[in-house]
Amino acid sequence: MKRSSVSTGGAGRLSMQELRSQDVNKQGLYTPQTKERPTFGKLSINKPTSERKVSLFGKRTSGHGSRNSQLGIFSSSEKIKDPRPLNDKAFIQQCIRQLCEFLTENGYAHNVSMKSLQAPSVKDFLKIFTFLYGFLCPSYELPDTKFEEEVPRIFKDLGYPFALSKSSMYTVGAPHTWPHIVAALVWLIDCIKIHTAMKESSPLFDDGQPWGEETEDGIMHNKLFLDYTIKCYESFMSGADSFDEMNAELQSKLKDLFNVDAFKLESLEAKNRALNEQIARLEQEREKEPNRLESLRKLKASLQGDVQKYQAYMSNLESHSAILDQKLNGLNEEIARVELECETIKQENTRLQNIIDNQKYSVADIERINHERNELQQTINKLTKDLEAEQQKLWNEELKYARGKEAIETQLAEYHKLARKLKLIPKGAENSKGYDFEIKFNPEAGANCLVKYRAQVYVPLKELLNETEEEINKARNKKMGLEDTLEQLNAMITESKRSVRTLKEEVQKLDDLYQQKIKEAEEEDEKCASELESLEKHKHLLESTVNQGLSEAMNELDAVQREYQLVVQTTTEERRKVGNNLQRLLEMVATHVGSVEKHLEEQIAKADREYEECMSEDLSENIKEIRDKYEKKAALIKSSGE
């Protein structure tokens, strides 16, 4: 079974000669005590401090003390940039899904879903955080107060590399805060999984076993290398910057462990040199001809184009060859037919020659027959010419008749096409109204075969045209009315858009005014806090001055006890003056603090009054929703200020 390799967040070291700084003020396993937060205008009451629970992943302290090195110091307070895509909605949804699945699988007591985790409240976040941290510290209980300091401190103690601000704890579900917090919760879930896997996993090495099992990433757990790393780290923390002795010891142990042969090493080194030379030679060839691959690709593309052209040419040749074969077959058939006709003609000539040889006529009979044949031939020629002329006339008439018939059929086809398109034919069509608008052309019926269709088609068609024109006029009037209505609607829409734009501008102005008021209130708070701090410093300075004067007076009193009776009245008067000054100073401080509180209350009331005046205008439903949101934010600011 493979053992998963675990990389801790802050214990691993990337380089052997960096990370020289060591925090000697790091805390141990116990978390620090809670500190009092000063309040305005009230006496601070000391609350009994209670020791918190032990943290499993507290900040570790170095076991070798501070370390001196000549290679420089790197500050550990550099702010690390978060590489995670926290602005990516898909990544945030994936983190929310992981959090929801982990809570559901591990028996979270409250109902939780993807929708409820899109923008949870502070109360829900504290419940989820307490449930998750309970896996690492089962006896942990979140305090009722100052959770905004407790939660970031716990993440910092666990080694979370990115800082969580206190202000983000008040607005957990805000769009600019929730991505950072849900990413931190997913990191905490990963810590829980690692902690669980470490508790359930077996030791890496048994006694006498220098090699462990292979992990998922293919790394072998080597006890010898781990011992070497521990020794080097201890030497490094004690101030050493070179580890030649450890390297030599590790090399000898590895040779003994793997039974290394020196001759094999030499042969491997020779092979390595040969391979390096080959690599260098190939690199030089690549530098000499950097675009060789591109040229080969172009050559390959051109050759592929030539292959395609040759294939097309071969297909054309094959088709041409098939055509020639067909022509050759036709010519062979024609030759066979002509040979057969030639043979038939030869037989007929032979028969006629036999008849001529066997006939019994005289020369006069032959001349008379020839003369009659010539006359008959002339008559035949004349009749043939007359027949050709009549046939030419007949052909012209037939051609004229065919053209006229074709024109009539074309017009009828166009008429039938338009009639079908207008739904006039067949007789039961939608727009036929019971009339038969189909024209049947029968040339054999004579020249008047189309006359009867004039009364059958023209009159109903004229009526339909009149009705259609009336409907077109009505539709045109209706269209004009609709266009007028559309223009009015467009004008109304334009006016509405202008009103919406005006309302948006007013909302933006109100939002800017609200942000300005919040900024002014924050600046006023900071100013009051700085004034209070300066007053506290002045008070401490006065107390130290008074204490110093009192000690000097006591020393002088010890030195001049003999003159006590003479100066007792003067000393009493000075003490009374000092007491009066202190009392007056305390009264001034209390009065100033009260005036600061009163000024803050007046500013808050003024901001609320201006806010209510701004929100009293009835703009639209959207502005009402924005007003509700602003009221919630103002209440939250007021509660945090109190």
UniProtKB/Swiss-Prot annotation:
Keywords: Acetylation, Cell cycle, Cell division, Centromere, Chromosome, Coiled coil, Kinetochore, Mitosis, Nucleus, Phosphoprotein. Residues 361-547 are annotated as: Interaction with PSMC2 and SMC1A. Phosphorylation begins in S phase of the cell cycle and peaks in mitosis. Phosphorylated by NEK2. Also phosphorylated by AURKA and AURKB. Acetylated at Lys-53 and Lys-59 by KAT5 during mitosis, promoting robust kinetochore-microtubule attachment. Deacetylated by SIRT1. It comes from the Eukaryota. Residues 18-33, 63-74 have a biased composition (Polar residues). Residues 251-618 are annotated as: Interaction with NEK2 and ZWINT. The keyword GTP-binding does not apply. This is Kinetochore protein NDC80 homolog. Acts as a component of the essential kinetochore-associated NDC80 complex, which is required for chromosome segregation and spindle checkpoint activity. Required for kinetochore integrity and the organization of stable microtubule binding sites in the outer plate of the kinetochore. The NDC80 complex synergistically enhances the affinity of the SKA1 complex for microtubules and may allow the NDC80 complex to track depolymerizing microtubules. Plays a role in chromosome congression and is essential for the end-on attachment of the kinetochores to spindle microtubules. The lineage of its organism: Eukaryota, Metazoa, Chordata, Craniata, Vertebrata. The modification Phosphoserine is found at S44, S55, S62, S69, S165, S242.
